[in-house]
Amino acid sequence: MSFFQNIITSVMKGTRRLNRFRSKGFGKLHNNINKAVDSVMSTSGEVSSLVFAEHLLNLIEDLDDNGLKKFLKDLLKNYSSNKNTENFEKIRISSEPGWIELFRRLNSSSNGTYRLVKLRERIRSLNDEDLKTFDLRLLKLFKYWFNPSFLVLEKIDWETPANILEKIIEYEAVHEINSWDDLRARLAPVDRQCFAFFHPLIPNDPLIFVEVALTTGIPKSIQKIINLDRQEIEIEDANTAIFYSISNCHNGLLGISFGNFLIKQVANNLKRELPDLNQFTTFSPLPGFMKWMEEYSPISFERCIEKNCDDEELIKNAVKYLTKSERKDGMPNDPVGRFHVGNGASLERINLNADMSAKGLSQSYGIMANYMYDLAVVEQNLSLIHI
């Protein structure tokens, strides 16, 4: 049994134990949500705390959006800093809102970590400034709970359990996976690989994954990477690893940068396995390019809309978009570029007609970019950014 399978088995055993404890009863389980909060916060027993927390999470998840807003605002009013100190001095630092401890206790319930991630996702979707503090405080907690040292890197292949493969199809954010044949083409061949980070408490749901093409040199279009009828190569012949799709899986974890650690760990692992690999690069979309042209180069934008934009004009605008910045922090205009440059990569090449899909044409008129991860200098590049 693999290490990862052991994690899943341990988590499932813990869930079954909690279900057995729940059936024994630990006092009244209040259907009044505010009383249910009091039960979670006032109990001192480890097992009873888990049972009360599980019950409260069920109540929270059953609330509609208006009910959730009311519950959270009541929580702010009743459990804010410097209030109820007497009741909670044993379970929290006095300078911290009491409801932070509530979330810590909810995290201990069955599948609590995942459910709190989904709760933050809901809170963000409400777009209520009064609830911003919950978004920020949960993010702070998640940065501890999802520390990279806790994460497990797993290779995803065609033999991976179907429930996880379904998640890969669902979460793919860059190049849509339209069928199981499409997925198989990205996972089964020896020159195509996929890696994901998992959290031990969310073992059946990836946090982020990257798809990798092993090639000879850098192709000029994404279609040469993802087409079903492409020519496969022997893995020993590859000299280049191309990270062509990176997908974050949970909106409730926005603000936590897993990608930096994922790419570098995968690159180093591949280099150990395949010493002949000498290039590690991305094949990246330019999701903001057309919007940028509409504002900063409107004549070129109109020509593109009319399909009358020449290559030289496109390249000139793309270079400006990717290398100049209208941002106060001086980082690249393009969000994908910011991510990779922020990780220590450097812009290597701009490719015309690289993504001729409807999505590729609408967001960047088919242009894509390569960002090079030079493992020898990537950390040095990163340090220069933060000087």
Model-derived regions, located:
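A general structural signal for short secondary-structure junctions and capping/turn motifs
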Residues: 157, 184-189, 197-204, 232-234, ...
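C-terminal/domain-terminus segments
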Residues: 337, 347-373
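N-terminal low-complexity, Ser/Thr- and acidic-residue-enriched intrinsically disordered segments
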Residues: 1-172
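Acyl-donor binding region in acyl/amide transferases
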Residues: 228-345
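Flexible loop/turn segments at secondary-structure boundaries
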Residues: 219-220, 250-252, 287-292, 356-358, ...
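A structural signal for short, well-ordered beta-strand segments and their strand-loop junctions
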Residues: 196, 211, 279-285, 349
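Conserved small/polar residues in nucleotide/adenosyl-binding loops
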Residues: 385-387
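Extended, Lys/Arg-enriched charged tracts that mediate electrostatic binding to polyanionic substrates
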Residues: 144-223
